[in-house]
Amino acid sequence: MASCDEIKEHPRSLSMCGHVGFESLPDQLVDRSIEQGFCFNILCVGETGIGKSTLINTLFNTNFEELESSHFCPCVRLRAQTYELQESNVRLKLTIVNTVGFGDQINKEDSYQPIVDYIDDQFEAYLQEEVKIKRALFNYHDSRIHVCLYFIAPTGHSLRTLDLLTMKSLDNKVNIIPLIAKADTISKSELQKFKMKLMNELVINGVQIYQFPTDDDTTSKINGAMNGHLPFAVVGSMDEIKVGNKMVKGRQYPWGIVQVENENHCDFVKLREMLICTNMEDLREQTHMRHYELYRRCKLQEMGFVDMGPENKPLSLQETYEAKRHEFYGERQRKEEQMKQMFVQRVKEKEAILKEAERELQAKFEHLKRIHQEERMKLEEKRRMLEEESVAFAKKKATCELFPNQSFLASGSSIRKDKDRKKADGASAFCDCLTAQESVRLCISSPRKDMD
């Protein structure tokens, strides 16, 4: 076993006796890459109106027709647009992600969070595709961000707190290239001081920006020199201006012309050379080998996967899976037991509550029953009294119906006697009246006789 390990660690070099043909592997790789095409994803971070879209148009010499953004966005949102470009026989699928509304809010505390979430979402999407049983990475559109062009306002003073917080949050997730936007607004001397101040602040605050690789002999010299020019001071423009006998891209001012591709005026050419011509593949590789691997490792560690066991022995995926399965099984059993105990406890508590409620209801029932019996007894007593009154009333009624006839007869005879007596009295009175009248008449007639 030891000899086998030794053979693996120290392979022997052999000379071939003739031509085989694997020398064409680089050509095969190139042909396959050309057939598949390439993808490159750029994240542009900067405040609204700082020149992000103009610079991208100038970099790729194409009008991408970006939509204008408002300065009154309530929150930061990211807008991704993908384009198919072709130069000679090389196809490039370019995705430009723009931060809409970045730095426009009054409260900028969490302005960087949507950017971080977007980058993590692209890593997560690639990871989910990678762990599938049937993977389709050949046709998968890789949306992971390969480079972040961070546009810094040309204040000439120092970095804003928002810029420091954002770059600090992104430096372990994406390759950051800081840019001083609209560099034609400050003088050359101020620009050099501003560059030194920015780099000093980035180092003090521990912000890791992308450094052009110097491990390749073919590009180490130029990359090392370009690292000293960071951050790049750039100017973007698609306007063609006539300078001498040729047309150049630039900006026309009353005091002169700023040529975009003139290295004495700005660092646009340096940025294009480093970003597109020299280090585009390194940016793609750094994204996959460094930033994505860091995200993947953290995710797997969160899931419990480790490379080494408790005794510093390497663990296979199957062993890790079995260990994690047993751990999850034990955790499930423990949680089930806790849930059972909690269920029993809650049942007991509920039973106690129900028994207490039952006792209260029984006491209330007894109380209402007692009140009902008392009311019933009162009603029975009232009914008995009413019956007695009814019997007494019936007796009185019968008595009243018997005596009224006798009293009526007695009263009738007395009435007749009174009538007879009244008639006799009337007759005697009438007689008396007649006698009186006769006497008067006689008295009157006697004087007449005397006079005669």
From Swiss-Prot:
Any GO BP annotation: cell division
Residues reported in the UniProt entry to bind GTP: 46-53, 101, 182-190, 236, 251
Any one GO CC term of the record: sperm annulus
Residues bearing PTM Phosphoserine: S414
Positions of region (G3 motif): 98-101
Keywords: Cell cycle, Cell division, Cell projection, Cilium, Cytoplasm, Cytoskeleton, Flagellum, GTP-binding, Nucleotide-binding, Phosphoprotein
Role of this protein: Filament-forming cytoskeletal GTPase. May play a role in cytokinesis (Potential).
Quaternary assembly: Septins polymerize into heterooligomeric protein complexes that form filaments, and can associate with cellular membranes, actin filaments and microtubules. GTPase activity is required for filament formation. Interacts with ADGB.
UniProt similarity note: Belongs to the TRAFAC class TrmE-Era-EngA-EngB-Septin-like GTPase superfamily. Septin GTPase family.
Protein name: Septin-10
